[in-house]
Amino acid sequence: MGIKNLNSVTASLRGTVLLDKSMLWKGKPEKSLVSYKISCGGRNSRGVITVRHRGRGHKRLYRIIDFKRNKVGVSATVERLEYDPNRTAFIALLSYDDGEKSYIIAPNGLKKGDVVISGEGSDILPGNCLMLKSIPVGTFVHNVELRPGNGGVIARSAGTYAQLMSKDGVYVLLRLSSGEIRKVLSDCRATIGIVSNLDNQNVKLGKAGRNRWLGIRPTVRGVAMNPIDHPHGGGEGKTSGGRNPVTPWGVPTKGKKTRKRNKSSNKYIKRVSDKG
């Protein structure tokens, strides 16, 4: 794919950098693989805001993605690559030899007409899915399972990956794109390759309206609020907040570790993320 640097014809286009989607499918998604998605705007069933800065956004259809890849031994041809409004990665529509269709997260380099397959003994090619114990050390993978058969949960967003570092009995060591090194059961499945849309990190939306299309509402600074609304609020004139940065609920922020020290999964993490 790539990115588009737009000319400054208007103020909202100045500095705008968008994704080039010219190589993606321009029609509607596969009808049998979509479902309606009702946006809740960050509210719960009582109408109370539980997640701030969430809005309605543009209407979307949810694409049903096959994260399990449990159709073993049946080859599938890539019909097309599509944009998915529900995630940063692109998706690929597969047509299996037995007539079934499914969506998968598209790895970088996958193109229309490629053949992919899931199962042991598959070639180490982008889009093929194998157990971690069957993948050579040093290979980049994505859509990695944490529990065998439950479907991939690690490395699913644009440009992410996990690199297989070593094998140790029933476990393998994976280095994630965040720098974290983690133990995973060798019977878990993973898909070969790095997730597509590597240029997503270079996108600059250019105007507030594009954020609203994505369902993101404005974020108000605490020092601009009243004392009732935020610990940094109030004061005469402009103030600095008067204390170390905290959330609206008084929890230290900007670098404060929030992970529980006694979490059961700590024993599987050999090195924490470089990004905190």
UniProtKB/Swiss-Prot annotation:
BP terms from Gene Ontology: cytoplasmic translation
Keyword line: Ribonucleoprotein, Ribosomal protein, RNA-binding, rRNA-binding
UniProt cross-references to Gene3D superfamilies, sorted A to Z: 2.30.30.30, Nucleic acid-binding proteins (2.40.50.140), Ribosomal protein L2, domain 3 (4.10.950.10)
Gene Ontology molecular-function annotations: rRNA binding; structural constituent of ribosome; transferase activity
Biased composition (Basic residues): 254-270
Gene Ontology CC: large ribosomal subunit
Region described as Disordered: spans on this chain: 224-276
UniProt similarity note: Belongs to the universal ribosomal protein uL2 family.
Oligomer status and interactors: Part of the 50S ribosomal subunit. Forms a bridge to the 30S subunit in the 70S ribosome.
Function according to Swiss-Prot or TrEMBL: One of the primary rRNA binding proteins. Required for association of the 30S and 50S subunits to form the 70S ribosome, for tRNA binding and peptide bond formation. It has been suggested to have peptidyltransferase activity; this is somewhat controversial. Makes several contacts with the 16S rRNA in the 70S ribosome.
Protein name: Large ribosomal subunit protein uL2
Organism the protein comes from: Ehrlichia canis (strain Jake)
